[in-house]
Amino acid sequence: MNVPIKLIGNGKAPVYKSAGASCLDCYARLDDTEVILPKERARIPLGFAMELPEGYEAVIRPRSGMTSAGVDTAIGTIDSDYRGEVCACLINNSTIRAIVKNGDRVCQMKIQRAEVITIVVTDELTDTERGSNGFGSTGR
């Protein structure tokens, strides 16, 4: 599947970094270094816009290298009708400031099908063994 990408400013196209990668790595597009203080968040432009086919979405995900350093990425959905610059929300959960420079790989992007469903309101749902037990009820 071909997905048209429009680069913005000094942006770089997302890339698969290995033959078995399921996600594309995305790069920060910054004019100046971004400093994210502990427990703060920052919106990082990724330097591209795209034209996803109808019926698909892009999901912005964390990179393990960033997460291991205490910098998480808020999960984000890019809909097929969005044409603006794709951005990532980085959250510094560490106790030291995080530095993001232009061209740093800051997140991953997964392109996947986005099924459209029809909501059917009902008074009853079928019973299951699990029922309404949640939040750790299935064990570790």
Task: Please place each PLM-identified region on the residue numbering.
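DUTPase catalytic domain/fold
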Residues: 1-140
